[in-house]
């Protein structure tokens, strides 16, 4: 049906919306599997372990196999292992991200003065004091961000995401991050393709954000499909340059669209 060896799917806004499956998403994912295509679920949510994501999606009714979930938190951990293997890392973010990094043997510090790397990320308990400490930690340290998502859609309304926290740190320090990880970065695309063991030309990426999901796919040479069940609107799609290869009301329409390919 697909003509693709692999499919990379966003989660929030694509498969799930407001904590519930997008109507038709479970069946669409099952039909993709029937084609034999490798499936990867890639979320820019850095706060959850892939295993936790898998359990949550399974509870919602999705079939998710081991190794089929990638997050911006994991991409960040791999970046730190490659580029800063022994450097103390100060996190401006949530405990879930700290736990994920610690589980991968990253050297975390609570002391802003000891930081060699500062990781900015979503923080739903962000305060002035945390901003102050993050600013102090950035003095002489490398600045990285887990992902650029300024907002996340919840129950039809936007909530501040990692990008908002990173922007606060960047504004206070008057500097941009040296690396922004997660989608749409080149490192994120490489991490995804490594996991599905496919080249970009045989991979389809599906998501609800033009600036992350589809930008990653377009830059890497993947085929792109925009779903309108999350952030992007049809007007956004019409104005996009380059235009998505597919524009769908939701992932439920994907099997039929690919059948005509």
Range-by-range predicted roles:
Residues 1-9, 16-20, 26-27, 31-37, ...:
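Asp-based, Mg2+/Mn2+-dependent phosphohydrolase catalytic module
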Residues 43:
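Conserved phosphate-coupling serine/threonine residues in phosphotransfer and NTP-handling enzymes
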Residues 73-77:
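Hydrophobic alpha-helical segments within soluble ligand-binding/sensing domains
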